[in-house]
Amino acid sequence: MSKIVKVIGREIIDSRGNPTVEAEVHLEGGFVGLAAAPSGASTGSREALELRDGDKSRFLGKGVTKAVAAVNGPIAQAVVGKDAKDQANIDKIMIDLDGTDNKSKFGANAILAVSLAAAKAAAASKGLPLYAHIAELNGTPGKYSMPLPMMNIINGGEHADNNVDIQEFMIQPVGAKTLKEAIRMGSEVFHTLAKVLKSKGMGTAVGDEGGYAPNLGSNAEALAVIAEAVKAAGYELGKDITLAMDCAASEFYKDGKYVLAGEGNKAFTSEEFTHFLEDLTKQYPIVSIEDGLDESDWAGFAYQTKVLGDKIQLVGDDLFVTNTKILKEGIEKGIANSILIKFNQIGSLTETLAAIKMAKDAGYTAVISHRSGETEDATIADLAVGTAAGQIKTGSMSRSDRVAKYNQLIRIEEALGDSAPFNGLKEVKGQ
């Protein structure tokens, strides 16, 4: 009943209006899995390759017909007849057939779409929700938790057309007792922030991930307006709501210095930028900082981990790119204490689960994440619950591509009840 009988790839549109790959995997018995690959804007240099056509006459070169052709041709031929329940085998077949270190022959976007679609089809054939199937693949059947959301309510950097350097300013509703309550709290702060920004004559247009993208006097001002909104919404900063940031520092790393336009083009060394961030953590209850330095600045990261690693969560995104080889090196060298998990950085479900396991086994936390280019595909919600990862980043309280994930989490929490606890701040490293 779980034998693959047909695989279909197609080019669809993501939340930025760019093409991406969608795959359908059909099994005996009529079971079907449908999944789409996301796409990043600020990308780590060591990510698996997202294959684009490069034909400027079509979608400005961003078409994915080559990746779709790989799905409909060699990938389909290789996996038809195979058992979709054997996820590791399906993924290995595709990876081996691609034969490159970074999936550049078929594209990580092609391989991932089929990998996730196969998992969804297998779950359907077993009569299980996707999160339950993922828990079984993870070797942790029946072990679930609801993730603490990091809600990106002010967008900067590569995710917005404004003068804010730091890419994401996030709130975490740690005072909530349930995921559903956390979403309500986040929504209330999000709408209150709009009023605060309007009262200051600032714009409330949103960026790629649904957060506001105003021009601000400095990076610290983003934290100040969020603090004002939290209070105006009736919550206590540090008790009900904590803060998190994604610096995406590789985006403003130039000639060995961190150059911040929002700070008057001031240039910082690794140590100076670490202390700049440390000062912000003393002013505001920031409990998590992602990519606080450039992905190649491992000496700087070692220093940053020494200074901040016992106090807050330091998440590696561009730093680790969901890659177990790189993560292993980071663990051995004591770099950061958490990993951001993005399916398409590595390109298959099996490799994603391996990265989560390696992180947890080493005492690192794992934060499940969307990309700035998303679709209505909500698989990351099931991944977060099915691996009991504990934390999720899936944008703000607007844009259907973001809200789709929150709504799926609401459904899952309703289905699982007490068997999927919401642990709040306990999930965050250092808290």
UniProtKB/Swiss-Prot annotation:
Q: What is the reaction catalyzed?
A: (2R)-2-phosphoglycerate = phosphoenolpyruvate + H2O
* Annotated PROSITE patterns: ENOLASE (PS00164)
Mind telling me which SUPFAM superfamilies this protein's record contains?
Enolase C-terminal domain-like, Enolase N-terminal domain-like
Enzyme class per UniProt: lyase
Record EC number: 4.2.1.11
Pathway(s) where this gene product acts: Carbohydrate degradation; glycolysis; pyruvate from D-glyceraldehyde 3-phosphate: step 4/5
HAMAP family to which the protein is assigned, alphabetical: Enolase
Extract the Gene3D superfamilies matched here. Answer: Enolase-like C-terminal domain, Enolase-like, N-terminal domain
A UniProt-annotated Pfam family: Enolase_N
Family listed = Belongs to the enolase family.
Protein's UniProt name: Enolase
Q: Which cofactor does it need?
A: Mg(2+)
- According to the lineage, what is the superkingdom? Bacteria
Catalytic site positions: E209 (proton donor), K342 (proton acceptor)
> Which keywords are on file for this protein?
Cytoplasm, Glycolysis, Lyase, Magnesium, Metal-binding, Secreted
Q: Main localisation, per the record?
A: cytoplasm
State the organism of origin: Pectobacterium carotovorum subsp. carotovorum (strain PC1)
A Gene Ontology term for the protein's cellular component: cell surface
The encoding gene: eno
Localization annotation: Cytoplasm; Secreted; Cell surface
Single GO MF descriptor: phosphopyruvate hydratase activity
Q: How does it assemble?
A: Component of the RNA degradosome, a multiprotein complex involved in RNA processing and mRNA degradation.
The positions annotated for binding (2R)-2-phosphoglycerate are Q167, K342, R371, S372, K393
